[in-house]
Amino acid sequence: MRPLLIAPGRFISQLCCRRKPPASPQSKICLTMARPSSNMADFRKCFANAKHIAIISGAGVSAESGVPTFRGAGGYWRKWQAQDLATPQAFARNPSQVWEFYHYRREVMRSKEPNPGHLAIAQCEARLRDQGRRVVVITQNIDELHRKAGTKNLLEIHGTLFKTRCTSCGTVAENYRSPICPALAGKGAPEPETQDARIPVDKLPRCEEAGCGGLLRPHVVWFGENLDPAILEEVDRELALCDLCLVVGTSSVVYPAAMFAPQVASRGVPVAEFNMETTPATDRFRFHFPGPCGKTLPEALAPHETERTS
């Protein structure tokens, strides 16, 4: 059996945010390349020849749909940044506050729709599937907009806002209720002057499995928690097989996902970054296309003149 590229035993699997990659014995293989190209015609040649395309997406794709990113200036909920609340320690200390934060995010998403970037990816996947080619989306986003756009081959490595996990019995279940429990109705306002609701724990979302009734938590990966090893193995298989990789709307500072594309690039596979600005990983990639993904991706993923037509 071949060794995994990103298996937990060889690389970090814990969710964390860093400006520089973690030290590892393999880091020396990710050599800095020549300045990446922004030549769309050259990228389109790679796209036309690719049989297995991996697309790694981050918050920048959904930002164009109006989804808060909780990054940079103005990236606060009340006086907190996401990294202050998206931790197991924060949930243990104040589950009411954390549930208010996620209730706000769930409610925001009800009015958001996929943008042209999401749709370009989904349409490309469907079109290439009919040609016997594969597109897989590996997303760090928890908003389900790729799913809503129609993407089928989807790995949501950080989970989703619309699933819960019981802290007692471990049951994972879809949950699209609005509000998720009566006590959260009208709660979660993001303004800094808003006071915490201080909802009693027994009024927060509870497990409905027979005989359980345990406290529910969002089924997302929090900072300091490990990603699901089974999902990491799926990611590894896809990245080991891909012959073209796109990195779209991601800052390349949240690990372990920030390692994925540089590892693909280290074996000579073309990697194209689509982002508003450069990232710590940009110089490792063959292509970089600045600008909104909703503008660059439709052109990049449009049918190529060499594609079969029905």
Swiss-Prot record:
Keyword Aminoacyl-tRNA synthetase attributed: no
Q: Which family does it belong to?
A: Belongs to the sirtuin family. Class III subfamily.
What does the UniProt record say this protein does?
NAD-dependent lysine demalonylase, desuccinylase and deglutarylase that specifically removes malonyl, succinyl and glutaryl groups on target proteins. Activates CPS1 and contributes to the regulation of blood ammonia levels during prolonged fasting: acts by mediating desuccinylation and deglutarylation of CPS1, thereby increasing CPS1 activity in response to elevated NAD levels during fasting. Activates SOD1 by mediating its desuccinylation, leading to reduced reactive oxygen species. Activates SHMT2 by mediating its desuccinylation.
User: What does the entry give for GO biological process?
Assistant: negative regulation of cardiac muscle cell apoptotic process; negative regulation of reactive oxygen species metabolic process; peptidyl-lysine demalonylation; peptidyl-lysine desuccinylation; protein deglutarylation; protein demalonylation; protein desuccinylation; regulation of ketone biosynthetic process
> What organism does this protein naturally occur in?
Mus musculus
Please share the entry's free-text remark on the cofactor: Binds 1 zinc ion per subunit.
Q: What is this protein called?
A: NAD-dependent protein deacylase sirtuin-5, mitochondrial
Top enzyme class: transferase
Task: Kindly identify the residues recorded as the active site.
Answer: 158 (proton acceptor)
Write out the domain note. In contrast to class I sirtuins, class III sirtuins have only weak deacetylase activity. Difference in substrate specificity is probably due to a larger hydrophobic pocket with 2 residues (Tyr-102 and Arg-105) that bind to malonylated and succinylated substrates and define the specificity.
